[in-house]
Amino acid sequence: MTRTVMCRKYKEQLPGLERPPYPGAKGQDIFEHISQQAWADWQKHQTMLINEKRLNMMNAEDRKYLQGEMDKFFAGEDYAQAEGYVPPAE
């Protein structure tokens, strides 16, 4: 049976992650409060930010910036967007 969580991002019961994505308290918090859908959406957005803003994951400041944006993304706050990006029309 699929484990469900009350997703912090989408404010509804959705399938949860299979395991914490990070070690420690941060990973456990994501595991308990973020759905698979929200995590997949974050990974797409994270990739866009890394590419468009040319972030270097070897740089501690860039990792800290990205983690801050992840927190905003999941909390429903305003988060950084790639300049000039227009989502595809459905």
Curated annotation (Swiss-Prot):
Keyword tags: Iron
InterPro entries per the UniProt record, alphabetical: Fe_traffick_prot_YggX, Fe_traffick_prot_YggX_sf
GO MF annotations, alphabetized: iron ion binding
Gene3D superfamilies: Fe(II) trafficking protein YggX
Disulphide-bonded residues: none
One Gene Ontology cellular component: cytosol
One matching Pfam family: Iron_traffic
Biological process, per Gene Ontology: cellular response to oxidative stress
Role noted for this protein: Could be a mediator in iron transactions between iron acquisition and iron-requiring processes, such as synthesis and/or repair of Fe-S clusters in biosynthetic enzymes.
Family to which the UniProt record says this protein belongs: Belongs to the Fe(2+)-trafficking protein family.
Protein name: Probable Fe(2+)-trafficking protein
Organism: Pseudomonas putida (strain W619)
